[in-house]
UniProtKB/Swiss-Prot annotation:
An annotated GO cellular component: plasma membrane
Entries under InterPro entries matching the protein: 2keto-3dGluconate_permease, 2keto-3dGluconate_permease_sub
UniProt record similarity statement: Belongs to the KdgT transporter family.
Protein name per Swiss-Prot or TrEMBL: 2-keto-3-deoxygluconate permease
Compartments where located: Cell inner membrane
Source domain of life: Bacteria
Organism: Pectobacterium carotovorum subsp. carotovorum (strain PC1)
Functional summary from the UniProt entry: Catalyzes the proton-dependent uptake of 2-keto-3-deoxygluconate (KDG) into the cell.
Subcellular location, principal: membrane
Amino acid sequence: MKIKQAIDKIPGGLMLVPLFLGALCNTFTPGAGKYLGSFSNGLITGTIPILAVWFFCMGASIELKATGTMLKKSGVLVITKLATAWVVALIAGTFLPGDGIQNGLLAGISVLALVAAMDMTNGGLYAALMNQYGSKEEAGAFVLMSLESGPLMTMVILGASGIATFEPQLFVGAVLPFLIGFTLGNLDPDLRKLFGNSVQTLIPFFAFALGNTINLAVILQTGFAGIFLGVLVIVVTGIPLIIADKFIGGGNGTAGVAASSSAGAAVATPLLIANMAPEFAPVAQQATALVATSVIVTSVLVPVITALWAKRFSPKHA
């Protein structure tokens, strides 16, 4: 059976299929983890420890070697994406209630959902698109985008916008596994290869555990809002990214369009933030479902828009 091949045909499938299976388990057999106990309970409820290992391996996979062009391009895109998410947090924090929108088609939209969906780029999607429509240096910019992975930047944005307060040690705890992995990976190429190969492997495991925190009813309730959020991510982050790429990064805007997506890893952010800041716990489940939908929407639309943009503005693809 070509199970992996079938999963790969679904945008973000490696993350979203196990997430959906976990949500199925949580909806119809919510006590399975406690009932089975032992290793099965660990797989079902182990989101945080599995993610900790994943962040460590992600850090180990990043090589501290890049050209000036690559650093300039990636720096411009990453800073623009984070700055945009911060502005959105400031605006949303002013107008949205603390527990998010409760009624209507946009029920579930909260500051946490908006920031989590917007502050992290799908690096793999970006690299694939820029390999096709850009230069090798532009494609290589995804390396710095890996620094967005995890809850750290979301914590910084929520803290800087005055929406949440985090104890200093929580910032250290959020980034420490990543930094240890990064250090070891750059000290020894063999360790980088060993741990770096585990990044993709661990995704289905933390996705399944994460899915076990979601009820399918929540996914159905937030369907339209999730689609809206995905489109909003492309428009709200895409426009500043295009402008920054053209006028600061020296590109033609294609890289900006390619970076206007939600990363699969962002699906885990609401739960991680709620684990450190309990005031977000009431909106975490809905935010997780919304971000998951946003990942699908941006994974489908961003490649299409990037291709159209490159055809219109890139000489070699005109």
